[in-house]
Each structure stands twice: as structure tokens, then as C-alpha cells.
Amino acid sequence: MMKKKYFLNANIIDPQNSIDEVGGLIIGENGLIEAAGKKVNTNNIPSREKYIDLKGNYIIPGIVDMRVFVGEPGFEYKENFRTLSEASLSGGVTSVVTMPNTNPIIDNVSIVDFLKRRGRDKAKINIFPTASLTKNLEGTNMTEFGLLQAKGIIGFTDGYKTIQNTRLMSRIMRSAYDLNCLVMQHVEDK
């Protein structure tokens, strides 16, 4: 069990609870937030306890990185879910949206199942995978949006590749509209 930690004079931003104020934060022995906001000040801290003065710094909810290229599966020698988690947490990132540019490419439900299990077992952060817009990232045939979305994919993208065929892109956008799913397109003419 850890000691209580006290942080004072921080700019606290928490959109979910409509907080945007200067105040403090108390983290309990269980590692959970006990109190936050402008009511947390030196009056809330036992006289012998030390506190960290965060004047000029911010306390915010965890950051979501919306475009992460992780090496798993296939390129684990570059990065895996464990190393991604450590690097992300050190910068305040608690959730990532991973791109489908892996080996194998995330374009079918069996790979999604593997990825979700692996992320759950190895990552210390939230992993939200995307699937490719097109099979094998080739820009010619759409993936099965409905099946992939049902497996927990939060969006579709070909990562750093772009869809150059306007007819295909139109079909993709119609399908995305019908299924109410997110499409992320890298903007670049080739």
C-alpha cells in the first residue's frame, strides 16, 4: 500500500465533471483519487505531510492518442503492447487507437480477436484497434465493415495509405454512414 499523495495549485481540467479551475488533488493509499478541485488546499493536508506544488502545471484526465502505429502483431521487435504502454503512460496517455498497418494487416475478424486478447493480456493502457478500409491495404476491395465493427473495431483506416479511387471512397463513406462507423483517411494525393 502506498502513502497518500497531495498535489496543490494545479490547473485542473476535467470536462466530464465540468471542472476548469486551480486547485489540488488527493490520491489515497489505494491509488485512487479521493478529492480534487479548488477545495483541496493546505487546510486539507495534515501538518506533517508533504505536498507537491504544481503551480503552472495541469492535471487532466488521461490523454487518448488517436493514431498509433504499434508493432504488434508482426513487428514486435520495434514495439509491443508492453513497451507501448510504458511509453504512453510516461506521457499521460492512457488510451490509444491503433492503426491496422501490422503483419498480418488488421482486415478480418480472426486478427481482431487475437489483437483484442493480446491487448487485454499485455497492455497497461486501453487499446482501441482500427481495421483497414480495404483488404490488405491495397485500396481496391473494402473490408467487411459490419463484421469487424461487431467484433469491437472502433473505426476504419488504411493508416498512412490513401484511397485514390473516388468510386471506392464513395462506397466506403456510404457504408460508414449506414453502420454509423468512424472513417479516418490519410489526406495525400499520390
Predicted regions located by residue number:
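N-terminal metal-binding scaffold of metallo-dependent hydrolase/deaminase domains
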Residues: 1-45
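Hydrophobic/aromatic beta-strand patches that form the interior of the parallel beta-sheet core
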Residues: 7, 50-52, 64, 97, ...
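Divalent metal-coordination and catalytic microenvironments
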Residues: 10, 25, 31, 56, ...
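A generic structural signal for alpha->beta connector loops
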Residues: 30, 48, 93, 124-126, ...
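Active-site metal-binding motif and surrounding structural segment of the metallo-beta-lactamase
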Residues: 41-59
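Metal-associated gating/positioning segment near the N- to mid-region
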Residues: 57-119
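Histidine/acidic-residue-rich, glycine-tolerant segments that coordinate divalent metal ions
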Residues: 102-113, 118-190
